[in-house]
Amino acid sequence: MCSKIKRIVAKVKKEGIVKPIERRIRNQQRQKEELKIIRKYHLIEDDERKRQREEVFDQNIKISVITPLYNTPENYLIQLIESVLNQTYTNWELCLADGSDAEHAVVRTICQQYAEKDARIVYRKLDKNEGNTNRAIHYATGDYLGLLDHDDILHESALYECAKRIRDGADFIFTDEMKFRESIEDSSDIVCKSGFGKDELRSHNYICHFVVFARKLLDGMSELYRKECEGSQDYDMVLRLTEKAEKIVHVPKILYYWRVHAGSVSMDLSVKQYAVDAAKKAISNHLERTKEYGQVECNLPYQTIYRIKYDLENTPVVSIYIWENGQEDIGGYIDKLLKKTHYRPLEIICDCKEVKNVVDPNVKIICHPQNNEENSYEWMKKARKHSTGKYHIYLSGYCMPVSEDWVEEMLMYAQRPDVGVVSANI
């Protein structure tokens, strides 16, 4: 107590009384504004809630919510089950696979009580805490599966919004989410995601929660979660499912509440090497399945952000177009550029009459001076007629690469059939 008083006195001496009070008021106002935004994005009005409950779907879309349990705190479990019971979409089942130990028999009691009241809740007590999610999937009867962790909560419209996308042909759906502590009003972070991007997913698992997918995507898989990817099983699962999905849809709404507490993954920010290794293995396996080969690396200093050094299929001629060069010594610029460029063979088309003192047997220099009436686009369009390269790089004469493998870095993406244009940071 004495040390606390000393700290307060020291703070008052340093800042006075007014500044801390003003800062506290500003923080309270900011929190109120943030809460308004949160409510705007994730709460629904009574009329909308009623409309969702009364909407009739032509298709019989049954969603099985899969939840593995292990020593789940009583209040967390009740909140989870109630969040599913409160769904505005009613064609669901909740599959609870319980691997809790004997000291947590209350988990079984609570689940059985709810299951007796609502037949849509299916509970199984497992003989051991292993493969709970996989086992729950085996007895699920829905054509679509949603994944809900045992200490989290669903937004009341979560299944309705997913069912709407399923009706429109989606077979893999993911939503935005919000981290919270004891109640959803006590939020700590809102996670608004981008739409599906293969390359972003290969760099980190940004999809996370809430995920609903068609059961047919599991065809040919022995299990959803693989033991060999323990530590990054969710990441491996998302990679495998999205490979097979035909229509992936992102719902830009907060439909999942991810609880933050002392024992949760959301609170544990430490990097575990086995999890990093498992993630790299999951990405490598994904590349093998898609026949896109490369080396997976950690994008240091961030160990859980990954980058792929794709193998080059071959070494085609790359044409580099240089324009807007304000230097009189274009030859000096090209010489410096070549020293900073490891890749060969190259073809350089430049806006000049001649280039001197550039000798490299694997580099062809083509001079194509720009007319005064031509803009850059017109010049490049005409210059292309002189090139023989399979790939084309347009480079301002004011730019210089910072790494010698800059062409390889761009080429390894450009060679992919699903990529048309590649750009770098300047």
Q: Where do the model's predicted regions map?
A:
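Conserved nucleotide-sugar donor-binding catalytic segment
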Residues: 197-284
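Short aromatic/hydrophobic "clamp" motif used to bind/position activated sugar donors
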Residues: 145, 392
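Hydrophobic/aromatic residue at the end of a short beta strand that borders the catalytic acidic motif
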Residues: 148, 153-158, 179, 233, ...
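N-proximal low-complexity "stem/linker" segments adjacent to membrane-targeting elements
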Residues: 22-83, 292-336
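Conserved donor NDP-sugar-binding/catalytic core segment of glycosyltransferases
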Residues: 157-188, 399-426
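Glycine-rich, basic loop-to-helix element that forms the pyrophosphate-binding segment
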Residues: 125-140, 370-387
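Short, flexible, basic/aromatic active-site loop/helix in glycosyltransferases
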Residues: 185-206, 424
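Acidic donor-binding segment of Leloir-type glycosyltransferases
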Residues: 85-125, 338-371
